[in-house]
């Protein structure tokens, strides 16, 4: 039986990597460290998936450039202090390896910067299993479709043969903007209620169920 999809594009944080708690703490702490108003962790977690510049604007509006730069530097320092300790969700590595072996093209589209993604791939040992990756250092932040558009062009896959997997509304809106089908996961940054307004073909509460679905494609 022929596959429904040729290309599977993964978000990273909150989809493959169990990193949402650490990211939230890093931005909450950074805001306090540079003298900005305290952040509610739930509010802070809702920006996961955006690029850092866009996240700062959503959280604090049009603050002075020097304050935004100080926050970005402090967040980056906080994040990299614990980055090497961030695990993948249980079963994620095996799922990626199996999908690769079965002939799927695999890619990453993330709000992380290039340095952060490269370090994450190095730490988890999965870099060789992805055919291409895109970050906010090369593309517009989600939900702009540029990451998906460039991945499909680079890997020569049509939108109807591409599947996006993510844990935020930014992932699902990006997929819609690129005319790509999507799967939502609720074990990451955003809840089922937050994600249910998008036309995902499936929604899963734990990685194990997502893996079962993907391995049945």
Please tell me what each predicted stretch does.
Residues 202-206:
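Short acidic-hydrophobic, aromatic-tinged amphipathic segments that line or gate anion-handling sites
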Residues 2-3, 101-104, 155-161, 217:
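Glycine-rich phosphate-binding loop signature in dinucleotide/nucleotide-binding domains
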Residues 1-46:
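Active-site neighborhood of HAD-like aspartate-dependent phosphohydrolases
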Residues 81-108, 114-118, 145:
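Short, acidic loop-to-helix structural element flanking the phosphoryl-transfer center
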Residues 85, 113-164, 169-178, 192-196:
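Substrate-recognition "cap/lid" segment bordering the active-site pocket of phosphatases
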Residues 48-80, 90-93, 97-100:
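A metal-dependent, Asp-based hydrolase signature
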Residues 26, 93-94, 98, 148, ...:
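Short glycine/proline-centered loop/turn elements that form peptide/ligand docking sites
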């Amino acid at each position: 039986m022929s596959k429904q999809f040729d290309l599977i594009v993964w978000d990273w944080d909150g989809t493959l990597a169990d990193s949402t708690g650490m990211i939230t703490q890093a931005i909450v702490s950074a805001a306090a460290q540079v003298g900005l108003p305290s952040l509610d962790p739930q509010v802070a977690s809702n920006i996961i998936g955006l690029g850092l510049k866009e996240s700062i604007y959503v959280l604090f509006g049009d603050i002075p450039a020097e304050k935004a730069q100080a926050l970005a530097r402090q967040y980056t320092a906080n994040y990299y202090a614990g980055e090497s300790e961030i695990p993948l969700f249980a079963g994620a590595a095996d799922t990626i390896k199996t999908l690769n072996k079965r002939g799927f093209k695999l890619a990453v589209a993330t709000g992380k910067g290039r340095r952060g993604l490269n370090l994450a791939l190095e730490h988890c040992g999965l870099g060789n299993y992805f055919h291409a990756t895109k970050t906010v250092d090369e593309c517009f932040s989600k939900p702009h479709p540029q990451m998906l558009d460039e991945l499909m062009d680079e890997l020569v896959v049509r939108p109807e043969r591409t599947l996006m997997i993510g844990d935020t509304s930014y992932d699902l809106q990006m997929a819609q903007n690129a005319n790509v089908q999507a799967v939502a996961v609720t074990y990451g940054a955003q809840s089922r209620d937050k994600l249910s307004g998008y036309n995902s073909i499936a929604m899963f509460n734990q990685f194990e169920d997502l893996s079962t679905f993907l391995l049945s494609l």
